[in-house]
């Protein structure tokens, strides 16, 4: 990854970029100039840039809800001309974009289907590095956390308006926070004094609320709460649930969709959906699949792939990633590749 240093890559080293390209490479190259790749989480454009470079005939559609990301990535990818198209949307707007979007690349996608797709889930490195967005808990900033800063509720809105039960649910469900109820009680007590506006006050509350023994062994006490608030603000699991059937419907035969998850709840959702799609609907006990019951997809990865030690050393943000890929098939074949 020598040519993708952080300093020369807009502050963002694309996680496992070579492996992401390898997972979709065979079919994309086979499709040639008919290949359309969807980078559904464009961010700084690192993965899209790599795809456009290593697949010189392919076209890329980049999706992002953040206008700033689209602008910066568009400038970065301008040298690829009409092989790249950026679209402002949450990634579960994919089906709408493919159905009604305008442009030669979208016309090609409607005609040929999607040959490869990447979903790099969670907050982008670029957003983490923008202090004013409020994603990071180590620097005081407004409690925003919106991936699209022009619409939707903020993290402050959640803390200042949600009930005790709803705050506890968010922290427990999306952050696996053991002390969700205790934190929710502290939030309600503190907001009676003054509404929450900045991250420093929330971090201070978490230090005061989470027991010292847990703080010593469980990592930064704000990590789980900030993660949970971000997921709620951006409706991340809802978006993921919505887009899974959208992308699998859009793949052409041989096309692959790759998902990079950084949290257990994301990976479990992807795993469950992939298992359902790759399981025969023939009743148990029959020797062959009945017509129309054979799976139309196969899992490409054996379980979830993880980043190598070398990758993590180069790019520490790759440490928690889990990668799963699925391929549309014409007829039933073996369920995983060797």
Swiss-Prot record:
<keyword id="KW-0698">rRNA processing</keyword>
<feature type="binding site">
    <location>
        <position position="127"/>
    </location>
    <ligand>
        <name>S-adenosyl-L-methionine</name>
    </ligand>
</feature>
<dbReference type="Pfam" id="PF01795">
    <property type="entry name" value="Methyltransf_5"/>
</dbReference>
<dbReference type="InterPro" id="IPR002903">
    <property type="entry name" value="RsmH"/>
</dbReference>
<feature type="binding site">
    <location>
        <begin position="45"/>
        <end position="47"/>
    </location>
    <ligand>
        <name>S-adenosyl-L-methionine</name>
    </ligand>
</feature>
<dbReference type="GO" id="GO:0071424">
    <property type="term" value="F:rRNA (cytosine-N4-)-methyltransferase activity"/>
</dbReference>
<protein>
    <recommendedName>
        <fullName>Ribosomal RNA small subunit methyltransferase H</fullName>
        <ecNumber>2.1.1.199</ecNumber>
    </recommendedName>
</protein>
<feature type="binding site">
    <location>
        <position position="64"/>
    </location>
    <ligand>
        <name>S-adenosyl-L-methionine</name>
    </ligand>
</feature>
<keyword id="KW-0949">S-adenosyl-L-methionine</keyword>
<dbReference type="InterPro" id="IPR023397">
    <property type="entry name" value="SAM-dep_MeTrfase_MraW_recog"/>
</dbReference>
<comment type="similarity">
    <text>Belongs to the methyltransferase superfamily. RsmH family.</text>
</comment>
<dbReference type="GO" id="GO:0005737">
    <property type="term" value="C:cytoplasm"/>
</dbReference>
<feature type="binding site">
    <location>
        <position position="120"/>
    </location>
    <ligand>
        <name>S-adenosyl-L-methionine</name>
    </ligand>
</feature>
<feature type="binding site">
    <location>
        <position position="91"/>
    </location>
    <ligand>
        <name>S-adenosyl-L-methionine</name>
    </ligand>
</feature>
<dbReference type="GO" id="GO:0070475">
    <property type="term" value="P:rRNA base methylation"/>
</dbReference>
<keyword id="KW-0963">Cytoplasm</keyword>
<keyword id="KW-0489">Methyltransferase</keyword>
<keyword id="KW-0808">Transferase</keyword>
<dbReference type="InterPro" id="IPR029063">
    <property type="entry name" value="SAM-dependent_MTases_sf"/>
</dbReference>
<comment type="function">
    <text>Specifically methylates the N4 position of cytidine in position 1402 (C1402) of 16S rRNA.</text>
</comment>
């Amino acid at each position: 990854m020598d040519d993708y240093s952080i300093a020369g890559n807009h502050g963002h080293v694309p996680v496992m970029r070579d492996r992401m390209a390898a997972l979709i490479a065979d079919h994309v190259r086979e499709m040639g100039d008919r290949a359309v790749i969807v980078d559904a989480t464009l961010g700084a454009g690192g993965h899209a840039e790599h795809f456009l470079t290593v697949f010189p005939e392919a076209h890329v559609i980049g999706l992002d809800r953040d206008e700033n990301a689209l602008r910066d990535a568009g400038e970065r990818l301008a040298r690829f001309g009409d092989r790249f198209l950026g679209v402002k949307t949450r990634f579960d707007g994919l089906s709408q974009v493919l159905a009604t979007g305008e442009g030669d690349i979208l016309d090609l996608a409607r005609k040929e289907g999607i040959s490869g797709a990447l979903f790099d889930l969670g907050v982008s490195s670029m957003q983490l590095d923008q202090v004013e967005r409020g994603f990071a808990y180590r620097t005081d900033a407004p409690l925003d956390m919106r991936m699209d800063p022009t619409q939707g509720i903020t993290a402050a809105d959640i803390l200042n308006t949600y009930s005790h039960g709803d705050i506890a649910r968010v922290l427990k469900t999306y952050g696996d926070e053991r002390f969700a109820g205790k934190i929710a009680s502290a939030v309600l007590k503190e907001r009676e004094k003054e509404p929450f506006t900045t991250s420093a006050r929330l971090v201070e509350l978490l230090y005061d609320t989470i027991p010292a023994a847990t703080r010593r062994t469980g990592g930064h006490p704000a990590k789980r709460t900030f993660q949970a608030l971000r997921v709620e603000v951006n409706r991340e699991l809802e978006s993921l649930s919505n887009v899974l059937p959208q992308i699998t419907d859009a793949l052409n035969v041989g096309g692959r969709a790759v998902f990079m998850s950084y949290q257990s709840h994301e990976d479990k959702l992807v795993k469950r959906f992939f298992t359902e799609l790759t399981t025969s609907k023939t009743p148990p006990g029959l020797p062959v699949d009945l017509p129309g019951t054979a799976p139309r997809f196969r899992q490409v990865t054996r379980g979830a792939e993880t980043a190598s030690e070398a990758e993590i050393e180069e790019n520490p943000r790759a440490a928690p990633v889990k990668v799963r890929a699925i391929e549309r098939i014409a007829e039933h074949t073996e369920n995983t590749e060797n």
